[in-house]
UniProtKB/Swiss-Prot annotation:
UniProt keyword annotations, A-Z: Gluconeogenesis, Glycolysis, Isomerase
GO molecular function term, any single one: phosphoglycerate mutase activity
Name of the protein: 2,3-bisphosphoglycerate-dependent phosphoglycerate mutase
InterPro entries associated with the record: His_Pase_superF_clade-1, His_PPase_superfam, PG/BPGM_mutase_AS, Phosphogly_mut1
Pathway annotation from the record: Carbohydrate degradation; glycolysis; pyruvate from D-glyceraldehyde 3-phosphate: step 3/5
Source species: Xanthomonas euvesicatoria pv. vesicatoria (strain 85-10)
Length: 249
């Protein structure tokens, strides 16, 4: 039996548009981002996908993308689970900074390492910074020590995997079709795990906003195939645009 899993990065956010490091900052979708959510729903509808359950983060850009896609799918009623474990990677002291200006200051190669390397985190955010997640009530029930002040992709994967094993994988093994709407780096972490991508290869992976990535898995949740829905060239161009965000102007 083939299991189906769709990974969907949220639509364009205001800070995507502004080319700023976002991380755990809870920013809104742009008008384009809302349109991308609807377009993603249409692509999934055209594919004939009927989901049994959906998962998202606790950040509104992912939540609103999921809502827009489900409305287009006419599956608004779908059970939705929200978890902080699906949040974007925490960008530490870089959060809020302009990516191009940061590249001009520190060099494009350093910014690429901070953005795309596997195990090198950006400079940490001080725990006394008002933006640290320990001061946000949506995380009030969590162990303060579990809340990051910065993350690499490696530590993001450590955060995401328990949710995969405890929540998503059992549903797929039960034959359910699952939609996960999250963020560029939490989805890169899942992609790395599912496809057994090397630490070096993951550096070059960029996930575009608002384009559903369909995985077909076997009974043991091994990947049989995966592809972006819609025009492959459009997905390629969108991924290249993501890669260019960390370059100096």
């Amino acid at each position: 039996m083939t299991r189906k899993l769709v990974l969907l990065r949220h639509g364009q956010s205001q800070w995507n548009l502004d080319n700023r490091f976002t991380g755990w900052v809870d920013v809104e979708l742009t008008d384009q981002g809302r349109q991308e959510a609807v377009a993603a729903g249409k692509l999934m509808k055209d594919e004939g996908l009927q989901f049994d359950v959906a998962h998202t983060s606790v950040l509104k850009r992912a939540i609103h993308t999921l809502q827009g896609a489900l409305k287009e799918l006419d599956q608004d009623w779908l059970p939705v689970s929200k978890s902080w474990r699906l949040n974007e990677r925490h960008y530490g002291g870089l959060q809020g900074l302009d990516k191009a200006e940061t590249a001009a200051k520190h060099g494009e190669e350093q910014v690429k390492i901070w953005r795309r390397s596997y195990d090198i985190p950006p400079p940490a955010m001080d725990v006394n910074d008002p933006g640290h997640p320990c001061h946000d009530r949506r995380y009030a029930t969590l162990d303060r020590n579990a809340l990051p002040g910065t993350e690499s992709l490696a530590t993001t994967l450590v955060r995401v995997l328990p949710y995969w094993h405890d929540a998503i994988a059992p549903q797929l093994k039960a034959g359910q079709t699952v939609l996960v709407t999250a963020h560029g780096n939490s989805l890169r972490a899942l992609y790395k795990y599912l496809n057994d991508v090397s630490n070096e290869q993951i550096l070059e992976l960029n996930i575009p906003t608002g384009i559903p990535l369909l995985f077909e898995l076997d009974d043991n949740l091994q990947v049989r195939s995966f592809r972006y829905l819609g025009d492959p060239e459009a997905a390629k161009r969108a991924a290249e645009a993501v890669a260019n965000q960390g370059k100096a102007k």
